[in-house]
From Swiss-Prot:
Top-level taxonomic group: Bacteria
One Gene Ontology term, aspect cellular component: cytoplasm
UniProt entry tagged with the keyword Protein biosynthesis: yes
Name the UniProt record assigns to this protein: Histidine--tRNA ligase
Keyword vocabulary terms for this entry: Aminoacyl-tRNA synthetase, ATP-binding, Cytoplasm, Ligase, Nucleotide-binding, Protein biosynthesis
Reaction equations catalysed: tRNA(His) + L-histidine + ATP = L-histidyl-tRNA(His) + AMP + diphosphate + H(+)
PANTHER family: HISTIDINE--TRNA LIGASE, MITOCHONDRIAL-RELATED (PTHR43707:SF1), HISTIDYL-TRNA SYNTHETASE (PTHR43707)
GO molecular function: ATP binding; histidine-tRNA ligase activity
GO biological process, one term: histidyl-tRNA aminoacylation
Family indicated by similarity: Belongs to the class-II aminoacyl-tRNA synthetase family.
Length: 429
């Protein structure tokens, strides 16, 4: 017996009843980014594997364990993008849009892919909205990105459910000094570390700081502190960021163990976290990557950005009951017509309504049917009102308007007054 066709594990369909919430969320973010002056960029979901090895780092978990990599017919190694920053940097380099210090404030949306163990809030195909800013190096732009996300949480009604965590990783030179001190300290206590941390000690020791192993965390209590190795430039930058967040009234906590999972970060790193989703608590994260463009072959170009996971934020909206009631309704009006002449008149009326009321969500019954069956479909559609057109209404050039939600009697409305009457009725519903 052949195996039934189904989606790949960890890669989910977004069904029609889920789509309105996704469109609401994506539209809210896109509208906000427009008001801040950010421009959208779209990059392919497939890139040369070398791009991610050079940007993310060859010895990271993402490159070593999680990427979907394959060889094409030309023998080139290609990878489904695991994150959006590297592709965005590649695009601005390839097209020269950051040359001569030109500022670029960009955003993107799309699918990312990582071969991880699927669980609630973590998937193998997932969606991100990300922002990247090039050629601005002050703490003011770092603050703008955080203020932008804070405003978004307000629009979504979730400010009380998220917390901002901040840290500074310093410059690459300061981080190298700290790395040496941390390795020396942990090497003397190697057997007390968990297996993952022992492996990371050689490849990516800073990642040990966010280990979930209790024994490792106990060892880290006495470890050197990153803030003690920060250079003056990074200290001034970090103080400037904190001062701006204080001025904007945005609460935050300093998390000295926040290092982020990608090698390219420097100076500012931040995460928005929630305790409402269990283990998958990070809903938005980002930071500064001033050396990445040069690392990928470009001229020295500063960069800062963030990415947010759409699935987790939608899950948070649902968990908190913050899904607007209006978006669960996909149709405002359902038109029922009985008889061939009424159907023809109904088509003309419906197109006239769409001309007069461009935002109207109007469904016209298709496939005929009795009054009872059409009215049942109208009610099931979730529409606020049914429009009823039969021989009697046709003779009088009227149409019946019947509320489907709540109280109210059917009214007969003249065709030429229908658009105005509908607009008022929907606004008051």
């Amino acid at each position: 017996m052949s195996k039934s066709l189904q989606a790949i594990r960890g890669m989910n369909d977004i069904l029609p009843e889920q789509s309105p919430l996704w469109r609401y969320f994506e539209g809210t973010v896109a509208g906000l980014l427009d008001t801040y002056g950010y421009s959208q960029i779209r990059t392919p979901i497939v890139e040369f594997t070398e791009l991610f090895k050079r940007s993310i780092g060859e010895v990271t978990d993402i490159v070593e364990k999680e990427m979907y990599t394959f060889e094409d017919r030309n023998g080139d190694s290609l990878t489904l993008r695991p994150e959006g920053t590297a592709a965005c940097v590649r695009a601005v380099l390839e097209h020269g849009i950051t040359g001569n210090g030109q500022v670029q404030k960009l955003w993107y949306i799309g699918q990312m892919f990582r071969h991880e163990r699927p669980q609630k809030g973590r998937y193998r195909q997932f969606h991100q909205i990300g922002v990247e800013v090039f050629n601005l190096d002050g703490p003011d732009i770092d603050a703008e990105l955080i203020m932008l996300t804070w405003r978004l949480w307000g629009l979504l009604g979730i400010q009380d459910a998220v917390k901002l965590e901040l840290n500074s990783l310093g410059t690459s030179e300061a981080r190298a000094r700290y790395r040496d001190a941390l390795v020396e300290f942990l090497s003397a206590r190697l057997e007390q570390l968990d297996e993952d941390s022992q492996r990371r000690l050689k490849s990516n020791p800073l990642r040990i700081l966010d280990s979930k192993d209790q024994n490792t965390q106990a060892v880290l209590v006495g470890a050197p502190k990153l803030e003690d190795y920060l250079d003056e430039e990074s200290r001034v930058h970090f103080e400037g960021l904190k001062a701006r967040l204080d001025a904007a009234g945005i609460p935050f906590v300093i998390n000295t163990k926040l290092v982020r999972g990608l090698d390219y970060y420097s100076k500012t790193v931040f995460e928005w976290v929630t305790d409402k989703l269990g283990a998958q608590g990070t809903v938005c994260a980002g930071g500064r990557y001033d050396g990445l463009v040069e690392q990928m072959g470009g001229k020295p170009t500063t960069g800062v950005g963030f990415a947010m996971g759409i699935e987790r934020l939608i899950l948070l909206l649902e968990t908190l009951g913050k899904v607007p009631e209006s978006i669960s309704r996909q149709i405002d009006v359902y038109l029922c017509a009985f008889g061939e002449q009424a159907e023809l008149a109904g088509l003309r009326l419906s197109e006239g309504l769409r001309d007069r009321l461009p935002g109207l969500r109007l469904a016209v019954n298709a496939g005929g049917g009795s009054f009872k069956s059409q009215f049942k479909k109208a009610d099931k559609s979730g529409a606020l009102f049914a429009l009823i057109l039969g021989d009697d209404e046709l003779a009088k050039q009227e149409i019946g308007l019947k509320p489907l939600r709540g109280q109210g009697e059917q009214q007969n409305i003249a065709w030429d007054a229908l658009a105005e009457h509908l607009e008022t009725a929907i606004a008051q519903a």
